[in-house]
Amino acid sequence: MAYKHIGVAISGNEEDALLVNKALELARHNDAHLTLIHIDDGLSELYPGIYFPATEDILQLLKNKSDNKLYKLTKNIQWPKTKLRIERGEMPETLLEIMQKEQCDLLVCGHHHSFINRLMPAYRGMINKLSADLLIVPFIDK
């Protein structure tokens, strides 16, 4: 199947390189657009009772550091049809919205072989809602 627009769910971790390389290979083969998608789920808001005066500054600093890492990853991709989307929202809803807006016909995401992921894989909630093909790349935990 020929893909026109490939979405890649990235987290800002080292494993992103594996996902991006797989997606980039497919994008080059299909002359497709490549969109890296990062969802900032605002996990820091889960603990609203924990607060100290510098909380906002620290959270902003961490977000900037994370975003810079993602921008650097995107900049290093040697493919002119590449872009990065960083959105605030919840998984999988926000990811599905972006996939639809971008008209992606393939989603590339990763999977850790851990006990918790066997019980509750992140992609389980989107399989029945996703209108694109799904490529799940296994991560080998060390």
UniProtKB/Swiss-Prot annotation:
Keywords (alphabetical) are: Cytoplasm
Can you tell me where the transmembrane regions are? none
For this record, an example GO cellular component is: cytoplasm
Predominant place of localization:
cytoplasm
Entry keyword annotation includes Cytoplasm: yes
Q: Which CDD domains match?
A: USP-A-like
> What are the subcellular locations of this protein?
Cytoplasm
* Pfam families xrefs: Usp
State the similarity comment. Answer: Belongs to the universal stress protein A family.
State what this protein does: Required for resistance to DNA-damaging agents.
> Protein name, please?
Universal stress protein D
Q: To which species is this protein native?
A: Escherichia coli O6:H1 (strain CFT073 / ATCC 700928 / UPEC)
Task: Please state the gene responsible for encoding this protein.
Answer: uspD
